[in-house]
């Protein structure tokens, strides 16, 4: 698929630090966060002017689903805009708490595990054609997804009975199946619940739930860009080596705990291969594919370059090659320096706090933002682009129709209902437009509906 629709859904961790007597549960904190949203949207599940969806997910986790994007870089911008949207809710919630005499700070974390061991996710969505074999797609994709934490993991200090270890991925220890239709109960690598949010005869939505939430823009770009290239190769029938794993769930945990990338993983055909070898195989094929198809866009060039350097960094253990571009490496460098400076072990509670602070989405507190400010974490997009994406939908996908409709209805104070495919005015006529084509950014029916307000 030359042009693909992408989207990211990110659940955020919520916590609160209170100074007074009154303590609030995460549920209560979440209600404070969403009070402003509920006051104008009459619900804690709303679509915004930029085409995105904002809602309160199970277990009081705020979730932001980006609008449909047809470009990896554009999606990185909209993913950042989601962080800014939630930062706005956070500031508003703190102000309300203060007005009510409750002293405390609200924290939102873009990570994947809380102190109680609960896991929440960052789900990637890729539109794929209905006509291919989904089984074949997942066969090729699973070894890639299991091993890609080597280059796109968010990193985490894990406390074990034998002491603390640094893992590549936050999510790896919480994945229980390869392919499944459930997302929470049995956390698979690929979720097969068939909800294309598009014409079901033409498309299906590949829902990848194995990935970490990334703070680094360059890591997000690599995660999406490399996965897109692997998908394109499968769609075009590129022959890839048989990499099916004997036990992908055991493999994902073993790989996460091995920073050398060299631990052998048993394959279904009896052979063994390391995460490094598996990733190198996909990278070589992707480079040949891009070369032969003439696909050298600036983003694809940047993705391939970072992919190659990240693997070289793991192979040589010289992480200075990517220590401003890959999340788990950026974070490890930060923790290592702090431990050396203060003579602390990895088990220190101060290190656990630092690990968490890396994922704080408040720009004045979050360590990733501070590093980016000092040039120690590279960017993909500018603050101006992110600011614009807060209120302007992507102009080349269905998100434009939805965003324009929401904006017009709010300005005209009209009652409306919106989801990924429907736009509805709740008037006597109950007029509804069904938008089944996610690639379509212009539609006369939507224009007429807006004009009729």
Swiss-Prot record:
Residues involved in Mg(2+) binding: 9, 55, 63
GO molecular function, one term: magnesium ion binding
Keywords, alphabetical: ATP-binding, Ligase, Magnesium, Metal-binding, Nucleotide-binding, Ubl conjugation pathway
Active-site residues, Swiss-Prot/TrEMBL: 57
Classification via Pfam families: Pup_ligase
Annotated signal sequence range: none
Superkingdom to which the source organism belongs: Bacteria
Function according to Swiss-Prot or TrEMBL: Catalyzes the covalent attachment of the prokaryotic ubiquitin-like protein modifier Pup to the proteasomal substrate proteins, thereby targeting them for proteasomal degradation. This tagging system is termed pupylation. The ligation reaction involves the side-chain carboxylate of the C-terminal glutamate of Pup and the side-chain amino group of a substrate lysine.
Name by which UniProt lists this protein: Pup--protein ligase
Organism field: Kineococcus radiotolerans (strain ATCC BAA-149 / DSM 14245 / SRS30216)
Gene: pafA
């Amino acid at each position: 698929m030359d042009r693909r629709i992408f989207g990211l859904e990110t659940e955020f961790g919520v916590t609160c630090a209170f100074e007074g007597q009154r303590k609030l549960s995460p549920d209560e904190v979440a209600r404070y966060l969403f009070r402003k949203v509920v006051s104008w949207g009459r619900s804690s599940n709303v679509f915004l002017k930029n085409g995105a969806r904002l809602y309160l997910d199970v277990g009081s986790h705020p979730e932001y689903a980006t609008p449909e994007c047809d470009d990896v870089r554009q999606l990185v911008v909209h993913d950042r805009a989601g962080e800014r949207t939630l930062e706005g809710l956070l500031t508003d919630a703190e102000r309300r708490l203060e007005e009510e005499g409750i002293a405390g700070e609200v924290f939102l974390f873009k990570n994947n595990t809380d102190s109680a061991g609960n896991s929440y996710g960052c789900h990637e969505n890729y539109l794929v054609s209905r006509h291919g074999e989904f089984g074949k797609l997942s066969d090729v994709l699973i070894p890639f997804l299991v091993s890609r934490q080597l280059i796109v993991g968010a990193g985490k200090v894990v406390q074990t009975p034998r002491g603390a270890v640094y893992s590549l991925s936050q999510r790896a220890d919480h994945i229980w199946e390869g392919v499944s239709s459930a997302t929470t109960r049995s956390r698979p690598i690929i979720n097969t619940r068939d909800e294309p949010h598009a014409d079901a005869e033409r498309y299906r939505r590949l829902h990848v739930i194995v990935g970490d939430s990334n703070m680094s823009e360059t890591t997000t770009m690599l995660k999406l860009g490399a996965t897109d290239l692997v998908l394109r190769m499968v769609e075009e029938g590129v022959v890839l080596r048989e990499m099916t794993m004997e036990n992908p769930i055991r493999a994902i945990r073993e790989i996460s705990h091995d920073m050398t990338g060299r631990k052998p993983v048993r394959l279904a055909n009896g052979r063994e291969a390391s995460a490094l070898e598996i990733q190198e195989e996909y990278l070589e094929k992707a480079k040949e594919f891009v070369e032969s198809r003439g696909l050298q866009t600036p983003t694809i060039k940047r993705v391939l370059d970072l992919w190659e350097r990240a693997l070289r960094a793991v192979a040589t253990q010289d992480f200075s090659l990517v220590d401003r571009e890959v999340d788990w490496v950026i974070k490890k460098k930060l923790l290592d320096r702090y431990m050396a400076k203060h003579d602390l072990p990895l088990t220190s509670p101060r290190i656990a706090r630092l690990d968490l602070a890396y994922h704080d989405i408040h720009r004045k507190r979050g360590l990733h933002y501070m590093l980016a400010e000092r040039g120690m974490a590279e960017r993909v997009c500018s603050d101006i682009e992110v600011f614009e994406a807060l209120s302007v939908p992507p102009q080349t996908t269905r998100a434009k129709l939805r965003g324009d409709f929401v904006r017009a209805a709010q300005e005209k104070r009209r009652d409306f209902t919106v989801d990924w495919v429907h736009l509805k005015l709740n008037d006597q006529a109950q007029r509804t437009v069904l938008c089944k084509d996610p690639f379509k950014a212009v539609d006369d029916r939507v224009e007429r509906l807006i004009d009729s307000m």
